[in-house]
């Protein structure tokens, strides 16, 4: 059997049926969980652009981040995920990410297929979702942010919207156990200097979350998601 290529998607993959499935998943899974297990407050929805050619870039604290971010911005978001996730034995997580429009990226050396997939996403009413830290980070610090997400922003002329996921301190085990706030920041223009974009994203995220900002001016130029 031919191995599935998880980093290659076309405009047809973001059709009416996937959009419907995505919406039903948000309404019947994400929203009930967010309302029953967590007391979630969303701030800054007025900052969500009307255009779908946007990159939503959030801090990464748990596996709940993608659906919570999508719920907060009220948009269909195709998330870029590290290829290692699709190589793992977690079949449920792999299925959910892929079925909801997500795709893989090689963070060290992005392939042509990844750029074609991002182009396909932006040719539809979907937006792109990225976590610039590249992995779940439990410590309350923002550091080691690479410029990969800026590469896609500049290539496809897409502004970056910071999304701060605040107050997560563990997975809820009973109803209304946890308080969470999701804060949507002001869009950052793709036309800014690369270092300025990184600093502004980190500044807004740290302002939202209260995390320590350790972002340095000099950043390595590898791709993260």
Question: How does the language model describe each region?
Answer:
Residues 41, 109-114:
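Glycine-rich, highly charged phosphate/nucleotide-binding loops
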Residues 29-30, 98-105, 132-136:
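Short, basic, glycine/proline-bearing loop/turn elements
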Residues 50-109:
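Catalytic core of membrane glycerolipid acyltransferases/transacylases, capturing the structured
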Residues 45-49:
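Glycine-rich helix-loop-beta junction characteristic of Rossmann-like nucleotide cofactor-binding loops
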């Amino acid at each position: 059997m031919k191995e599935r290529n998880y980093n290659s998607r076309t405009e047809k993959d973001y059709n009416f049926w996937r959009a419907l499935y995505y919406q039903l998943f948000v309404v019947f899974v994400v929203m009930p969980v967010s309302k029953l297990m967590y007391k979630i407050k969303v701030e800054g929805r007025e900052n969500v652009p009307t255009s779908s050619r946007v990159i939503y870039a959030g801090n990464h604290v748990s596996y709940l981040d993608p659906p919570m971010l999508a719920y907060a911005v009220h948009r269909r978001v195709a998330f870029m995920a590290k290829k290692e996730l699709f190589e793992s034995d977690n079949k449920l997580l792999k299925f959910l990410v892929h079925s909801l429009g997500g795709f893989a990226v090689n963070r060290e050396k992005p392939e042509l297929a990844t750029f074609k997939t991002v182009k396909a996403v932006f040719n539809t009413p979907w937006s792109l979702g990225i976590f610039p830290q590249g992995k779940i980070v439990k410590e309350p610090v923002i550091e080691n942010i690479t410029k990969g997400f800026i590469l896609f922003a500049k290539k496809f002329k897409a502004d970056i919207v910071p999304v701060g996921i605040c107050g997560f301190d563990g997975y809820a085990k009973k109803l209304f156990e946890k308080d969470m706030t999701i804060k949507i920041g002001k869009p950052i223009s793709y036309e800014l200097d690369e270092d300025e974009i990184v600093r502004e994203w980190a500044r807004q995220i740290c302002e939202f979350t209260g995390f320590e900002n350790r972002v340095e001016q000099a950043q390595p130029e590898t791709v993260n998601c």
